[in-house]
Amino acid sequence: KDLANQPPNVCFPAYLAEQAQSLANQYPELLTVKVLGEKDMQQLGMNCFLAVARGSAHEAKLVLLEYNGKAAKKDKNSKTKGKKSSLEEPIVLVGKGITFDSGGISLKPGLGMGEMKYDMGGAAAVMGMIKALCEARLPLQVVGALACAENMPSGTATRPGDIVTAM
């Protein structure tokens, strides 16, 4: 909730990555965070996602949060100590983190433009869920993936008809 209410001149992709790292610092035994920058994503062939961010002065980030509930079972303060999860594979949550979506060079109507900061609500929800898991210390394995970018008009923005290859 608090993340989604940040103004777009504060909440950029790097800000979301910083908030995730701050959360990991609060729960180092339960949560690890890895942040991929644009060069990392290019090497992975994530060019369709990067095309969204081409017009922005702010670098896109892919934020990966890995909640390790197995560590919670060993914690003496855990409310679920001794309980086992039947899940072998992790639960994966993906959150859209477009910190401001102007529409790029195909600008959205001005009337609702102020609301476009909420296009990162999915990323905020995933981060909130990960925080809740850390607080509850549930014996689950959960990965949160936040695709964070800003979609802005500029001379470098993706144009209609551009060909983008990916993975």
Please name every model-derived segment:
Residues 84-124, 166:
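Active-site metal-coordination/substrate-binding segment of hydrolases
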Residues 44-48, 102-111, 153-159:
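Short acidic, glycine/serine/threonine-rich loops at helix termini
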